[in-house]
């Protein structure tokens, strides 16, 4: 029997929708234009000032947008911008289409949010999967696009073609914690209870939490039903699933905790989705 699900009020969730900020690439271009404009004006009005003097005067104003920007903000504002500025060998996209009821989504895989790739592949063994991975030897954070800005065409298509999405993420903390959010509040609560019963440090987030993932702009919430579960795992917890937590070694050093955890998630999906 299909279970009754409780939706989040999407209008209320929209209040916390992330305002799209200019990317750092865009800010840099604007700064160059501002530099040219200021240089010409100063040079005309005060021709006796040297070029070095002009640069000293205007440099603080050019750097101001970068100091004001959130340190964790994306470098790029869209996938198209990322693709135009990054080497194609530095990222990969993997997809598999199966039952349209559930899509396993991991848009920060590889070295971006380490461990989410391996978890997504295992959980989606017999399910639909979308996976974006950063493959740089270092600096994969440059490939991070927030869920509200991730607009890679295949990802958007697959999300819309599935009725529910389970989105895997990682956040930086040495503590071992799992934060459960998403718009599918009933199933999110059920999953939290299941994880707790199996001994995992899970907590259900309120819709106002920054990791709740309930914004209508969030890619995971653009499925045919608008229902999602977002699983945010701390660095400490993700590290506990592998014997060696490096990009090249994670796939071959998944430990018993990894397989117990992914089986718990997989069994939950089988029992609660049709």
Model-identified regions with their sequence ranges:
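Positively charged N-terminal leader segments that act as targeting/secretion signals
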Residues: 21-26, 53
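Bacterial N-terminal signal peptides
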Residues: 56-65
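Bacterial N-terminal signal peptides that target proteins for export
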Residues: 46-54
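Polybasic, lysine-rich low-complexity intrinsically disordered segments
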Residues: 11, 20-21
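N-terminal targeting leaders characterized by basic, low-complexity, disordered sequences
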Residues: 1-7
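N-terminal catalytic or cofactor-binding beta/alpha core of small enzyme domains
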Residues: 69-274
């Amino acid at each position: 029997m299909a279970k009754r699900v409780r939706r989040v009020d999407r209008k209320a969730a929209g209040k916390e929708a992330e305002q799209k900020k200019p990317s750092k690439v865009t800010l840099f271009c604007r700064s160059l234009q501002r530099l040219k404009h200021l240089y010409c004006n100063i040079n005309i009005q005060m021709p006796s000032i040297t070029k070095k003097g002009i640069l000293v005067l205007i440099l603080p104003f050019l750097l101001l947008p970068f100091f004001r920007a959130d340190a964790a903000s994306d470098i790029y504002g869209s996938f198209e911008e990322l693709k135009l500025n990054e080497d194609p060998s530095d990222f990969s996209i993997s997809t598999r289409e199966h039952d349209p009821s559930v899509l396993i989504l991991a848009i920060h895989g590889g070295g971006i949010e380490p461990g989410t790739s391996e978890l997504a592949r295992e959980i989606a063994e017999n399910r639909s999967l979308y996976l974006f991975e950063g493959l740089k030897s270092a600096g994969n954070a440059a490939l991070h696009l927030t869920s509200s800005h991730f607009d890679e065409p295949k990802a958007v298509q697959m999300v819309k073609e599935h009725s529910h999405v389970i989105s895997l993420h990682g956040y930086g903390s040495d503590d071992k914690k799992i934060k459960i959010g998403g718009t599918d509040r009933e199933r999110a609560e059920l999953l939290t209870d299941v994880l707790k019963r199996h001994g995992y440090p899970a907590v259900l987030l309120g819709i106002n939490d920054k990791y709740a993932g309930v914004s209508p702009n969030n890619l995971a919430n653009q499925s045919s039903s608008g229902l999602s579960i977002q699983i945010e795992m701390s660095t400490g917890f993700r590290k506990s699933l592998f014997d060696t937590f490096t990009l090249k070694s994670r796939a071959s050093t998944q430990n018993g905790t990894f397989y117990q955890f992914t089986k718990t998630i997989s069994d939950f999906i089988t029992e609660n989705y049709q």
